[in-house]
Amino acid sequence: MTYKIYFLFFIFLGCAQVTSLNLQKHQFGQIPTKIVWIQVAGFEEEHLATLKFDSSTKDEALSFEKFLCLGKAWEYNLYNIRPTAESSFLGQLTGDRNIKNSCEDYKAKPIWKLISKNGYKVGAFENGASNDESLESAKACGQDGSNFLDDLVIWKMNKAPAKSSQFFHVNEKSNFEKKTTYYDRSCLTGECYSNLSQNIKSVFSQFSRKSDKYLFIVRDFKYKSDLASKNYSKYKASLKELEKTVEYFLSLSSESKNMLVLLTSAKSKVLEFPKSGNQWKEFEQSGKYLIDRKSKLISTVMASGARAENFCGIYNQSQILPRIFSGSKQQGLELAIINPFD
């Protein structure tokens, strides 16, 4: 009888322990009902040195450093090694490695088609996406493309194609409708006067209002363009905007146990940072040592909040999607495998 008491004591003691991930308190097996997915073309975590070694912030932890989990995803599919950023992002959103850069790609089901039937609101915010990079490129693929974009609201920081387009603005309140694309009113001349973090805060607060289930996707292609320009000021400004965006969403996730903040990259670029203090000063002033090489074969994944534990490790890009929901859920003293898509 004594042995049974000790056995039960240790079981309940284990259940009462506070679990942690990356030395931070974390509840495992939590199903995300509020999902923010940030896709950044060109990003690689070493780029954060640009902000980390800034004289004004070097002793402070960056928002990026507060993610609970850092993972890596292989950048290839069935047809290409180092595919384009838009192809990689499509593979991530659909969980499909069979990406051909053709209309056939839009026959696959993206994440929003899997969860919208369960009451999730879905929206995608695009920054600096070209016609080929934008999700709207699916519209050129007939019914498959139209079906692919069903239930989706799209916001774009781009110049509107026509005066009759729908618009949003950082200082305006709107009721956003499904199957509609909204353009940033501040981009009418081609150059956007509102910044990324302010726009996202404004749009997201309206989009998520009175909603317990949502998927909000941020797709940033401007970062890749600014990096390729080798203009240090533009590149650093884009990175700072991402830092502010991450800070905003991580702050929200700390207040909601059902919220997942996921950041993934594609076409990740390696930068050759300077080796010494004097060179770093030149780098900051002129971007003299801002040299980029070929994109990497492996890209960055960062996660915090519900199901963050699933994103540690190395895996294929097509495996990012199922990791959002698949896994184990604690039920009493046993673990049961769940899948909300069944």
Locate the predicted segments by residue.
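Active-site nucleophile/metal-coordination loop of metallo-enzymes that catalyze phosphate/sulfate
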Residues: 21-34, 44-145, 303, 312-314
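A long, amphipathic alpha-helix that forms part
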Residues: 21-24, 28, 194-216, 223-259
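Metal-dependent active-site segment of extracytoplasmic phospho-/sulfohydrolases and closely related
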Residues: 45-48, 241-279
